[in-house]
Amino acid sequence: MRLAVRASTRWPGRPAGESTGVERGLQAIPSSFALRRRYREPVPFAEVDGVRLHYCDAGASEPAVVLLHAFPLHAGMWAPQLEHLSTGRRVIAPDFLGFGGSDAPDSMYRYTMLGYADLLAGLLDHLGLVRVVLCGLSMGGYVAFAFLRQYPERVSALVLAATRAAADTTAAFERRTDQQDQIAGIGTAALLEVLLAGLLSDHTRATRLDLVEQTRRLMANPAAGYIGALEAMKHRPDATGELAGITVPTLVMVGEDDTLSPPDVARSMLDGIPGAELAVLPRAGHLSNLEAPEEFNAAVTDFLSRQ
């Protein structure tokens, strides 16, 4: 199988031979999911509202699927899905502001859920896409809610994976503030290890050391992106009251062993969204698309085939 994935052979301003964050992520995925890439564009980024957004673009048929990555990873986490889903339709995987190959401004006003959603809308305009299927995992789900709130006419279907509709609790808000202070003081390295423990299931961390290391690499993003995303997440609005108004086909996905957004949270969203479907992935934690890629891909493919 030959995939047409638009990606850059060199990031402008970087030394020759040094790959972008997305390319490092793609290379770090297990070899059974390695992308066989044919480059279509010399530089895969879009200028939107004064910032440069990096993205991956594979496949052809529409409506396109837009994959929204988790915190604190970048779009490289979607390599198994880019390979599988793009055999049937176009797949876009952008880096959020502050992550991967996208710009990482220090100005915190740029980092809000609405800001991420507006930049995504600008990217879709750049790509000529009017309506898309949104698939958001964890923070990507928060952005999906923001996009659906602001641009409902541009969403044809929705996949919500390892995420929640509720806003942060007071404890979660304070924890994110402490994490921001820690990053500002000593950088991301120590926090990275703390976050990593919650992203993967105990089973994965005990038996798949390669995936643990690959996930660690996917988390190597600018400090400004970390701090900005934490700011956006702790101030995100509660979307629980909006669930009943979601009218597009929706698939809710969760790893059986996810401790950050556990199955009971997924079921509460399922109950709130009219006609929604649920997929629980066995022995997978928060990053179910990497821990159980075959099951994740199968569930999404089946869902899309019926839309």
Predicted segment positions?
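Flexible "cap/lid" loop of the alpha/beta hydrolase fold
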Residues: 142-193
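Conserved alpha/beta-hydrolase catalytic His-Asp/Glu region
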Residues: 168-174, 185-245
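Short beta-strand/loop motif that positions the catalytic acidic residue
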Residues: 246, 252-254, 258
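Catalytic histidine-centered segment of alpha/beta-hydrolase-like enzymes
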Residues: 284-297
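Alpha/beta-hydrolase fold catalytic core
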Residues: 1-6, 10-12, 18-66, 86-89, ...
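Catalytic histidine neighborhood in serine/cysteine hydrolases
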Residues: 263, 267-286
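Active-site glycine-rich loops that stabilize anionic/oxyanionic intermediates
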Residues: 70-73, 138
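Active-site loop/oxyanion-hole signature of alpha/beta-hydrolase fold enzymes
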Residues: 48-56, 79-83, 92-135, 151, ...
